[in-house]
Amino acid sequence: MEAAGGEQRELLIQRLRAAVHYTTGCLCQDVAEDKGVLFSKQTVAAISEITFRQCENFARDLEMFARHAKRSTITSEDVKLLARRSNSLLKYITQKSDELASSNMEQKEKKKKKSSAAKGRKTEENETPVTESEDSNMA
């Protein structure tokens, strides 16, 4: 049973490597067209291998940051910690994180308004309407 799981894992890793290699090739083609330079197949392969290994390191670091904080979920704070050595990347990630946080707050507020409006309608529906005869007794 473990052998099948290991084979499945290796298959997924190979697919991921292929996807990274393909994406690297596409990016190299774009740069080649833009800058008028050529990339050999060996160069593309080397860049994709370095990229894949760096992604593995990032994944391990993110897992360790979360584990150190006694969490099982990686948060945006972990990603910011990972990007701390690159000021421009950290600035970009912080900006996007703030945008996501404000967007999430807006969505929560909309949900609250919708639910409170729905509750208000339900209480209005539950109240019995006052008829004129009952109203005249009050006077």
UniProtKB/Swiss-Prot annotation:
Which biological processes are named by the entry's GO terms?
A: cell division; DNA repair; replication fork processing; resolution of meiotic recombination intermediates
Basic residues composition bias: residue spans? 110-120
Against Gene3D superfamilies, the record matches this protein to: Histone, subunit A (1.10.20.10)
- Name a GO CC annotation attached to this entry: FANCM-MHF complex
The observed outcome of changing K41A is: Abolishes sequence-specific DNA binding
Has keyword Isomerase? Answer: no
> Which InterPro entries does its entry note?
CENP-S/Mhf1, Histone-fold
| Keywords tagged on the record | Cell cycle, Cell division, Centromere, Chromosome, DNA damage, DNA repair, DNA-binding, Kinetochore, Mitosis, Nucleus
What are the boundaries of the region Disordered? 99-139
Q: Name one Pfam family in it.
A: CENP-S
Q: What is the effect of changing R15A?
A: Abolishes sequence-specific DNA binding
| Keyword Cell cycle annotated | yes
Q: What happens when you mutate K70A?
A: Abolishes sequence-specific DNA binding
Which Gene Ontology MF annotations are present? chromatin binding; DNA binding; protein heterodimerization activity
Where, subcellularly, is it found?
Nucleus; Chromosome, Centromere; Chromosome, Centromere, Kinetochore
Assigned protein family: Belongs to the TAF9 family. CENP-S/MHF1 subfamily.
Q: What does this protein do?
A: DNA-binding component of the Fanconi anemia (FA) core complex. Required for the normal activation of the FA pathway, leading to monoubiquitination of the FANCI-FANCD2 complex in response to DNA damage, cellular resistance to DNA cross-linking drugs, and prevention of chromosomal breakage. In complex with CENPX (MHF heterodimer), crucial cofactor for FANCM in both binding and ATP-dependent remodeling of DNA. Stabilizes FANCM. In complex with CENPX and FANCM (but not other FANC proteins), rapidly recruited to blocked forks and promotes gene conversion at blocked replication forks.
PANTHER family for this protein: CENTROMERE PROTEIN S, CORTISTATIN
How does the annotation summarize its subunit structure? Heterodimer with CENPX, sometimes called MHF; this interaction stabilizes both partners. MHF heterodimers can assemble to form tetrameric structures. MHF also coassemble with CENPT-CENPW heterodimers at centromeres to form the tetrameric CENP-T-W-S-X complex. Forms a discrete complex with FANCM and CENPX, called FANCM-MHF; this interaction, probably mediated by direct binding between CENPS and FANCM, leads to synergistic activation of double-stranded DNA binding and strongly stimulates FANCM-mediated DNA remodeling.
Protein name per the record:
Centromere protein S
Q: Upper taxonomic classification of the species?
A: Eukaryota, Metazoa, Chordata, Craniata, Vertebrata
